[in-house]
Amino acid sequence: MAQAKEVRGPGPRMGGPRPKVENPGKLLKRIMDEVFRHYLPHCILVLVCIVVSALANVQASLFLKTLMDDYIVPMTQQQDPDFAPLAAALLRVGIIYVIGILAAWGNARIMVNVTQGTLRNLRTQLFTHMESLPIKYFDQHPHGDIMSVYTNDVDTLRQMLSQSIPQLVSSAITIVSVFFSMCMLSWQLTIVTMLMVALMMFCSKKITQQSGKYFIQQQRDLGKLNGYIEEMMEGQKVVKVFTHEQKALAGFRQLNDQLKDSANKANSFANIMMPVNAQLGNISYAVCALAGAAMAVSGMGGTTLGTVVAFLSLNKGFNMPISQVSMQANSIIMALAGAERIFKMMDEESETDEGYVTLVNAKYDRNDQLVETDERTGLWAWKHPHHDGTTTYHKLEGSITFTDVDFGYVPEKTVLHDINLYGLPGQKIAFVGSTGAGKTTITNLINRFYDIQDGKIRYDGINIHKIKKADLRRSLGIVLQDTHLFTGTVMENIRYGRLDATDEECIAAARLANADGFIKRLPEGYNTMLTGDGANLSQGQRQLLAIARAAVADPPVLILDEATSSIDTRTEALVQRGMDGLMYGRTSFVIAHRLSTVRNADCIVVLEQGRIIERGSHDELIAKKGKYYQLYTGNLAEN
């Protein structure tokens, strides 16, 4: 099949220049909007808890001045001190601390609920949006990179929401309340403290600037590594067949080393921040202690021993939030890098659908008029609303026509040229040609995985752009080139073709596809669990289940994309008999490597480099001795 994506060999993908987070403020606002949309009352309660906890800590520090000046110092001057007032004072301090602890505990418990709920909502939105994305998005993005958004990037938000943002808010409230408290105790010592804080902030800014860019690169490198691992897991058989284990390992090591380097640089800068700030905080504490002691001894500004003790406690409480702000800044930067990837995926344009013609169950009334019904009658009709408010119903026949169709996966490169063909109800149309001729591309246009650039495709005379995509695809039974089975029972995988199908209908579909025989030989029959994309089945058995899945949908049009290319000759004969019964009365578009499977086609279309070069029945094309004759006889050297 012609593809619009870049074809690359199995190996590491080298990145370009180091990425930067665009509009971090806008990203943070978008995250918080998501939180507030569902958890605003919880966030208000968290804020109350943070304020109570911060004020409790400040009040406890201020109480030290009263404790020293009014209780402890006077008691040292008494021969027979009374400890009862001191005990009462200590009890009050203890109550203050308990209130602070309870508030901090409440804050943590509520934030766990808010964080996990927000992440659940984000994952749901991501998956919902992913389901609406066009096929070309998945053709152009490595699946491992998409998985990394769900896992690594979402997890970075968990740390930011549960720890970083609450600590930043707590630190901000603590800094403000402690600052005013320090000013009340001693403006001179406050100036000394602020000078040291300015130095801490300067150092933190420099460190954050260096670590931030490496945290962003770390997230990108992690996504690349995940994508490579998934690619190698899916292609493990190919790797082993061509004995490329060492090449695969070399590619992994390169990406793994790339991740190690960016993670080392990011965490090296981040890890030195705490020790640097801690040492600067200790210096600030020591300088304030010396200055405070000198002021207390000289009596400057009415400074007492209690003032110095309380101020030193506040000094510690002031430096710690400053250090936390610096450390959490790195976590937030890393989370914003993940958020950028999350919202980039969520902002991808959904698959557009301007269709208004729908597919409905129908029946004939007493006047022999086609009318809509809720019952499954086996008769389908196109429901066509008109501008004048009227609605007409047209029986679904299964006629598909291509008229002057041009298409390219990218606008500047056309891969299908001037395609004209038709499939009448009940006809079997076969596409043959060399690899890359455009056979599968045509089937992708029928189900509108991609839209044409020029020309028209009509379904029962209706332009398929007027038909809603879901209804269009519901009328098509498709057996894809790569058979995909889901984790679940055999019965559930067959029922995937029509979710309301009964067990009896699923079994009948399996019999029609000649899959019933091997299914009954499975350990649990139709209740046998399939895992790992049906890894416990042979390729032929998986193909048979895919055909049964299409059969249970009972569609008027079938698309069989190389459905029997991976099945042995004996199994192919079984499938072919089942498919002949399934295709009877249905318009069928078939692609097959084995031309013997399409000899009975009503029309064989020969494609070469995106153009139709021959068409006709098997006998007609053999008589022409053209391209089809060469393909059928293997005489490709002729002409």
Regions found by a protein language model. Name each.
Residues P74, S181-L195, K265, F269-E340, ...:
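Helix-loop-helix
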Residues R37-L40, I135-K136, V154-L161, I165, ...:
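An intracellular "coupling" helix at the cytosolic face of ABC transporter transmembrane type-1 domains
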Residues P17-G25, V48-C49, A56-I72, I96-H143, ...:
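Juxtamembrane helix-loop junctions of ABC transporter transmembrane domains
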Residues Q79, A362-N639:
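ABC-type nucleotide-binding domain
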Residues V51-Q59, G94-W105, L157-M160, S164-V176, ...:
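Hydrophobic alpha-helical transmembrane bundles that constitute the permease/transmembrane domains
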Residues P12-P19, Q116, T124-S148, N152-V154, ...:
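Short intracellular "coupling" helices and adjacent cytoplasmic loop segments at the cytosolic face
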Residues H38, H42-L55, I96, L102, ...:
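Transmembrane helices of ABC transporter permease
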Residues M1-N57, I72-V93, N107-M111, T115, ...:
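Membrane-integrated ABC transporters
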